């Protein structure tokens, strides 16, 4: 699971609502998986990043040199875009868990895929 994906996921356990974000990330296996650099794509994703969730996830993974927010003129700043490309798209959680901050519900990550399926009792009606 890429950090970009993590930044978009939230819990939909019944009664949680908007308090199901951000999911707490705990990884037992992380890999760096090279991806072709696409500065236009990264620049388009920057405004969508929820920075507090991103920084918390990066801290949980013990990543270093993580920008605290978008730099001015980031669209033309190749160094910033490459750093964000690496963090959002190349750092992959292979095994671990995501935890709902409100309900405590754990969602497993297996082979890079987060399992967000809920039982019928957990779903919102």
UniProtKB/Swiss-Prot annotation:
The keyword DNA-binding does not apply. This is Multifunctional methyltransferase subunit TRM112-like protein. The gene is TRMT112. Transmembrane segments: none annotated. Acts as an activator of both rRNA/tRNA and protein methyltransferases. Together with methyltransferase BUD23, methylates the N(7) position of a guanine in 18S rRNA. The heterodimer with N6AMT1/HEMK2 catalyzes N5-methylation of ETF1 on 'Gln-185', using S-adenosyl L-methionine as methyl donor. The heterodimer with N6AMT1/HEMK2 also monomethylates 'Lys-12' of histone H4 (H4K12me1). The heterodimer with ALKBH8 catalyzes the methylation of 5-carboxymethyl uridine to 5-methylcarboxymethyl uridine at the wobble position of the anticodon loop in target tRNA species. Part of the heterodimeric BUD23-TRM112 methyltransferase complex; this heterodimerization is necessary for the metabolic stability and activity of the catalytic subunit BUD23. Part of the heterodimeric N6AMT1-TRM112 methyltransferase complex; this heterodimerization is necessary for S-adenosyl-L-methionine-binding to N6AMT1/HEMK2. Part of the heterodimeric ALKBH8-TRM112 methyltransferase complex. Part of the heterodimeric METTL5-TRM112 methyltransferase complex; this heterodimerization is necessary for the stability of the catalytic subunit METTL5. It is found in: Nucleus, Nucleoplasm; Cytoplasm, Perinuclear region. Belongs to the TRM112 family. Gene3D superfamilies: 2.20.25.10. Changing residue 5 to A: Abolishes interaction with N6AMT1, METTL5, TRMT11, THUMPD3 and THUMPD2. Reduces interaction with BUD23 and ALKBH8. Reduces expression of exogenous TRMT112. The keyword Nucleus applies. GO terms for cellular component: cytoplasm; cytosol; nucleoplasm; nucleus; perinuclear region of cytoplasm; protein-containing complex; tRNA (m2G10) methyltransferase complex. The modification Phosphoserine is found at residues 119, 125. It comes from the Eukaryota. Its main location: nucleus. Changing residue 113 to D: Strongly reduced ability to promote N5-methylation of ETF1 together with HEMK2/N6AMT1. GO terms for biological process: maturation of LSU-rRNA; maturation of SSU-rRNA; peptidyl-glutamine methylation; positive regulation of rRNA processing; rRNA (guanine-N7)-methylation; rRNA methylation; transcription initiation-coupled chromatin remodeling; tRNA methylation. Keywords: Cytoplasm, Nucleus, Phosphoprotein, rRNA processing. InterPro entries: Trm112 (IPR039127), Trm112-like (IPR005651). The lineage of its organism: Eukaryota, Metazoa, Chordata, Craniata, Vertebrata.
